[in-house]
């Protein structure tokens, strides 16, 4: 059998550490959508997030043709927590992470099945909607009003969000998930934006990074979540002054060593090449970073045998770091990788498809409004 380009690169000695082995990463993401290793079993309740990393990773590699899109779309819709006939569970709607509860398979828009322990999870709703858009679905079977009602029920008085209606930790991660959900559904009624903005604003720490909440430690991940949320809202420059933005930029740019770390005096980690790199991109100063050092670090964590990326060199690859490693390389315009939308965390091709979808909804609503006016007159 003829050797692939990746096989030739993998046998090329010193150059193998610095070559991006695209085909191996495609196969790695394919495996993530099939039977997972035992060590992933604890993630069963959030399987939809693993599907997101794999599907968006394949999309970034322009390789979605290797999966059965229709089957995956049906599976994702079966995870939607739909309103019951009496709509008494609206505050619990959204998407669950997998079929672990044994709820009947229902990929339709029919009324849901009442279950005392069934509810959506904010991160699963975010990744579920993202996956559907990545796969080219038009979201016609998403009960948008129910998703937004479920989202509203998760916002707390301080403006942050918890993950599930039963209560959980509440922090900047879920503010970002909520912002993405509202942005994708093109409807910001799912949150009190003023309260969410206030929460982001109060989370700015003494050293000018953003924390998970007020009074906590600045972190690269929470800084991304806060800045990206404001960008999706179109409020970044209203919330922070130019002087404050310059301080945030300085804090972010100081996170680079070779790759990036999330906090001072912590080791670099592959995923921060996206979290911090995307923040710098949104702040329009990514071009001032050292691309070569960042690229070399990311590729030093590449598994040259099975594909994927790890958080550190000589560690096991996983779906999360494989995806964010590729997104980090995309920010530097690596050959063979599509461009990433830094705020929404999907390919720009997917973000453009979403924009077209929003336009079609707007056209449909305008026509319906016009028809109603015509009928009433």
From Swiss-Prot:
Transmembrane segments: none annotated. Its EC number is 2.5.1.59. PFTB repeats lie at residues 144-186, 193-234, 245-284, 291-333. Zn(2+) binds at residues 269, 271, 321. InterPro entries: GGTase_I_beta (IPR041960), PGGT1B-like (IPR045089), Prenyltrans (IPR001330), Terpenoid_cyclase/PrenylTrfase (IPR008930). GO terms for biological process: positive regulation of cell cycle; positive regulation of cell population proliferation; protein geranylgeranylation. Binds 1 zinc ion per subunit. GO terms for cellular component: CAAX-protein geranylgeranyltransferase complex. Its cofactor is Zn(2+); Mg(2+). It catalyses: geranylgeranyl diphosphate + L-cysteinyl-[protein] = S-geranylgeranyl-L-cysteinyl-[protein] + diphosphate. Keywords: Magnesium, Metal-binding, Prenyltransferase, Repeat, Transferase, Zinc. GO terms for molecular function: CAAX-protein geranylgeranyltransferase activity; heterocyclic compound binding; protein geranylgeranyltransferase activity; zinc ion binding. Pfam families: Prenyltrans. Geranylgeranyl diphosphate binds at residues 219-221, 263-266, 272-275. Belongs to the protein prenyltransferase subunit beta family. Heterodimer of FNTA and PGGT1B. PGGT1B mediates interaction with substrate peptides. Catalyzes the transfer of a geranylgeranyl moiety from geranylgeranyl diphosphate to a cysteine at the fourth position from the C-terminus of proteins with the C-terminal sequence Cys-aliphatic-aliphatic-X. Known substrates include RAC1, RAC2, RAP1A and RAP1B. PANTHER family: GERANYLGERANYL TRANSFERASE TYPE BETA SUBUNIT, GERANYLGERANYL TRANSFERASE TYPE-1 SUBUNIT BETA. This is Geranylgeranyl transferase type-1 subunit beta. It comes from Rattus norvegicus. The gene is Pggt1b.
